[in-house]
A protein has these predicted regions:
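Pre-Walker A (Motif I) flank of P-loop NTPase domains
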Residues: 1-2
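NTP-dependent small-molecule kinase module
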Residues: 128-187
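ATP-binding Walker
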Residues: 11
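P-loop (Walker A) phosphate-binding loop of NTP-binding proteins
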Residues: 8, 20
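Walker A/P-loop
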Residues: 14
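ATP-dependent small-molecule kinase phosphotransfer cores
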Residues: 25-81, 173-174, 178
Length: 187
């Protein structure tokens, strides 16, 4: 089973991937694969990001990992792969996301871009556009420590993504953050 582990940068993908690896799960860093296998087809200078040939990357993942038991495909593009069976979308409150990305030394404009993406559910919307809703869960990592998050993800896998109503898509909504800023400007 191929499981995409995705989310806006700063939601905890890399941290949880390290814990899952320590627990004997195979974790593939999609960004590393894209770099190593020359699936980068350009650069978006405005957004300071690489442009990845997702179709070719998908074919590579399908060809090399589809027959394995459980493989996590980690990265904020992993949900775009049609070859994955399940998707775990990690979410984080925008204020906490700002703190996490600031601690990583990110520039303000890039932090703002990612906060906006999180508020607008960009990754979740892209995920639902490519995968059946029953194959997708979303987890709020805002106040969750990494060990508890790892245990939760393992539980979700054991339950085969079923009976996890709390983690069904649509339970996390940061849209009030847009309104908060709007109302602060009015007052």
């Amino acid at each position: 089973m191929l499981i995409a582990l995705t989310g806006t940068p700063g939601t905890g993908k890399t941290s949880i991937s390290n814990i899952l690896s320590e627990n004997s799960f195979e974790v593939i860093d999609i960004n590393k694969v894209a770099d190593d296998e020359d699936f980068i087809i350009g650069n978006d200078e405005k957004r300071n990001s690489k442009i990845v040939d997702v179709d070719t990357l998908n074919g590579y993942i399908k060809e090399n990992y589809i027959k394995k038991d459980i493989v996590f495909i980690e990265g904020h593009l992993s949900h775009l792969l049609k070859s994955v069976d399940k998707v775990i979308v990690l979410r984080c409150h925008p204020d906490e996301l700002r703190k996490r990305l600031s601690q990583k030394g990110w520039k303000k404009e890039k932090i703002k871009e990612n906060m906006e993406a999180e508020i607008l559910d960009i990754i979740l919307c892209e995920t639902v556009d490519k995968h059946p809703k029953k194959s997708v869960v979303e987890i709020d990592t805002t106040n969750m420590n990494i060990s508890n998050l790892a245990a939760l993800i393992i539980e979700i896998i054991k339950n085969k993504f079923e009976h996890m109503k709390k983690y069904n898509i649509g339970n996390i909504d940061w849209s009030e953050e847009i309104l908060k800023d709007f109302y602060n400007k009015v007052e």
